Amino acid sequence: MLIPKRVKYRRQHRPHRSGVSKGGNRITFGDYGIQALEPAYITNRQIESARIAINRHVKRGGKVWINIFPDRPLTQKPLGVRMGSGKGPVEKWVANVKPGRILFEMSFPNEEVALEALRRAGQKLPCKVRIVKKEDQF
């Protein structure tokens, strides 16, 4: 699972989900990518599930890059606990994703297999995504 090794503060405020991505919105490493179309918190489990979906479909060959990292903790108090008495424990780690962000990149010789693998990975994510190609970028 993807979690930070060490953080300065264990509990943080929730990040803002408004606006568009300022960086990371172009394919830099691979030939194909998954781009977010709406804001979302993507957990470490969802990232891992999408990565496994890509690797299972392509079997051998190619390379996958994960461009997001879940560096923000989300806390939650237990069910049935009254208000007050401090912030709850860390429940999960999330990556704050804004529209336009490239989430995954991939290089693979066969275009049809690569696009199908990215489509399957996009179904594991909690936001609307689209598949982009490097040559389509301007």
UniProtKB/Swiss-Prot annotation:
UniProt feature, compositional bias: Basic residues: 1-19
Classification via SUPFAM superfamilies: Ribosomal protein L16p/L10e
Entry-linked CDD domains: Ribosomal_L16_L10e
Disordered as annotated region, ranges: 1-24
PROSITE patterns: RIBOSOMAL_L16_1, RIBOSOMAL_L16_2
MF annotations from Gene Ontology: rRNA binding; structural constituent of ribosome; tRNA binding
Matching InterPro entries: Ribosomal_uL16, Ribosomal_uL16_bact-type, Ribosomal_uL16_CS, Ribosomal_uL16_dom, Ribosomal_uL16_sf
Entry GO terms, CC: cytosolic large ribosomal subunit
Assigned keywords, A-Z: Ribonucleoprotein, Ribosomal protein, RNA-binding, rRNA-binding, tRNA-binding
Domain of life according to the entry: Bacteria
Pfam families: Ribosomal_L16
Any one biological process term the GO annotation gives: translation
Assigned protein family: Belongs to the universal ribosomal protein uL16 family.
PANTHER family in UniProt: 50S/60S RIBOSOMAL PROTEIN L16, LARGE RIBOSOMAL SUBUNIT PROTEIN UL16M
Assembly mode: Part of the 50S ribosomal subunit.
Role summary: Binds 23S rRNA and is also seen to make contacts with the A and possibly P site tRNAs.
Protein name, per record: Large ribosomal subunit protein uL16
Species, as recorded: Corynebacterium diphtheriae (strain ATCC 700971 / NCTC 13129 / Biotype gravis)
